[in-house]
Amino acid sequence: MTRRKFLKIAAAGTALGLVGGPSFSLAKEEYDLAVISGQPVAATRKALEAIGGISRFVKNAQRVVLKPNMSFARTPDFSATTHPLVVATIAQACMEAGAQQVLVLDHTLQRAELCLERTGIREACKNIPGVHVLALQERKFFGEIKIPQGKVLERVEVFKEILDGHVLINIPVAKSHSATGVSLGLKGLMGMIWDRESFHSQYNINQAIADLATVIKPQLTILDATRALASGGPGGPGEVKKPNLIVAGIDPVAVDSYGVSIVPWYGQNFRSRQVEHLLVAHQKGLGKIDIDQLKILKEKA
């Protein structure tokens, strides 16, 4: 998608119909989102604390899947992948909460070994007992599920670990995307399916992402906006901004909607309703889209 095409689609998105979404809240039922500024480790810890602690989501002896973006063989300064210290901090917190095992998983787009090495995520997690970082590139690791609420998708093959009842925490990075304008939490769900190419070639990708979000529902989304790839996404190189933010919430649409507001994309500011897959997800009742109607806790780490 060219910059011009994204701008055109974004402008059209504001004219689409609107449907209210469900309510979500965080610690003490006061906030929809926690937005914490600071360095990766401190801000991530503060965000987990602000949402009531990781123990709200991870119980003793549970197995956990962390889904960062590590699809590209890029170092963290490219902002094409989730910051390794953000991932490691969350993984450590899960184990401290009593998790039996933490699997850090992604279906990488590029060569698995290079992705694991260059993103720094495997290195950051290697000394945390019970944490395993894996790139799943074989079909045997995926299982098929039906999508009852799908408009263009009837079924999809997803990580088997999701089907096995693991706690799922989505840890996307904030970046632009050539096909969808931005890539945040909902777009990042595509890293958990086998056949991503069909989203690009067979379906309206924005509708397909929203369909996918009806069956893959992370218990928690933590957006890494310590850096943001404001152009040239998803793989870069491009313009890298440094908001130094961590955004955490239960509502994936709300997290992404705030993410849209963090930096200008392609040199222009956008509203969440101008991002088609977010608007469609909101219309499906998957979350709140208007950030001026969200209760947001903002703090510094």
Please tell me what each predicted stretch does:
Residues 1-301:
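N-terminal and secondary-structure boundary signal
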